[in-house]
């Protein structure tokens, strides 16, 4: 291990997903970057998976939450633990990913090249369709309902192989400088699921740091593997609608609401028509419950300190 390699703490969440998480851990063992640790945060699993994972991968640092704290809450537990022990970088990594052997080294090299770079993302490909892009950078603007994911579902044919600055970094896999986290804080837990990475990206750019997409770093993603367990009962619809409204209330200037709300209403109507045509009333109900929850959720004080 070169003396110049910064220490990286890889924070991974597990929730009742032994085999998927183990596949991710096994891919990390094959990396050529060696100065790292894995902080596995179990989010209240009831299937015995945390104990089985520790037996299969005894090198991990296991933290067990009593209940499911959501993506942001679970990640924050791991991030704060790593920061207390003096890490140089934190890598938030979804458990349903497989990484290329040189992926972490590529990310660290770019992050180390410029003090204004606060966080970096890899190129993300679909696991089941490895010739298709899941993420090749992202853009976020105040009036948009969701960030624009560059290259989504396009073929990985070299078109997106240029490193670029981005305004949206996906929480699927992003490497963050520890000093930046100490300055701008951890993830906002009010979202529980979705939108926490969007807000963190916004705070990053507002603090004067850059987010960068690094195409030479590659991972493969089983997108929405965990959330699909809950898709039939409207989990995704609820948290997308709720998160959008919470984010808008917190961060979208009032002067932009006349531009944003027509898009949001059109999205709600479209989703309603789609689910109604499928006679999936649970998703319709979840969509409007999420909208209402987003309108009435108490917004927390700006305290995301470490």
Feature-to-residue mapping (PLM):
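Acidic helix N-cap motif at the loop->helix transition within catalytic regions
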Residues: 47-55
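Short beta-strand-to-loop acidic/aromatic patch adjacent to the donor-nucleotide binding site
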Residues: 87-98
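Short, acidic, metal-binding catalytic loop of nucleotide-sugar glycosyltransferases
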Residues: 26-35
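Short beta-strand/loop segment that forms part of the nucleotide-sugar
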Residues: 36-44, 63-65
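Non-catalytic, C-terminal membrane-associated alpha-helical segments of glycosyltransferases
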Residues: 235-242, 253-306
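Glycine-rich, basic loop-to-helix element that forms the pyrophosphate-binding segment
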Residues: 65-85
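Catalytic donor-sugar/metal-binding loop of nucleotide-sugar-dependent glycosyltransferases
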Residues: 182, 186-192, 198-220
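Acidic/His-rich active-site region of diverse nucleotide-sugar glycosyltransferases
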Residues: 73-77, 97-98, 103-186, 190
């Amino acid at each position: 291990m070169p003396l110049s390699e910064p220490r990286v703490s890889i924070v991974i969440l597990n929730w009742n997903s032994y085999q998927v998480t183990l596949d991710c851990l096994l891919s990390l063992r094959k990396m050529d970057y060696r100065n790292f640790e894995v902080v596995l945060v179990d989010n209240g699993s009831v299937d015995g998976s945390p104990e089985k994972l520790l037996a299969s991968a005894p090198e991990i640092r296991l933290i067990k939450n009593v209940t499911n704290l959501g993506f942001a809450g679970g990640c924050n537990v791991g991030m704060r633990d790593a920061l207390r022990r003096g890490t140089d970088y934190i890598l938030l990594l979804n458990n349903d990913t497989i990484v290329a052997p040189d992926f972490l080294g590529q990310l660290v090299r770019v992050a180390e090249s410029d003090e204004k770079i606060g966080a970096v993302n890899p190129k993300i490909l679909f696991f089941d369709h490895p010739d298709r892009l899941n993420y090749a950078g992202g853009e976020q603007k105040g009036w948009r309902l969701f960030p624009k994911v560059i290259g989504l579902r396009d073929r990985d044919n070299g078109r997106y192989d240029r490193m670029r600055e981005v305004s949206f970094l996906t929480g699927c896999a992003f490497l963050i400088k520890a000093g930046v986290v100490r300055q701008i804080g951890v993830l906002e837990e009010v979202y529980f699921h979705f939108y926490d990475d969007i807000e963190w990206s916004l705070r990053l750019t507002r603090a004067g740091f850059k987010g960068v997409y690094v195409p030479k770093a590659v991972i493969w993603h089983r997108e929405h593997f965990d959330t699909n367990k809950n898709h039939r009962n409207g989990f995704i619809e609820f948290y997308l609608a709720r998160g959008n409204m919470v984010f808008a209330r917190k961060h979208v200037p009032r002067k932009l609401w006349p531009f944003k709300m027509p898009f949001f209403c059109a999205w709600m109507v479209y989703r309603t028509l789609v689910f109604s045509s499928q006679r999936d009333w649970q998703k319709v109900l979840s969509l409007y419950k999420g909208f209402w929850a987003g309108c009435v959720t108490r917004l927390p004080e700006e305290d995301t300190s470490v």
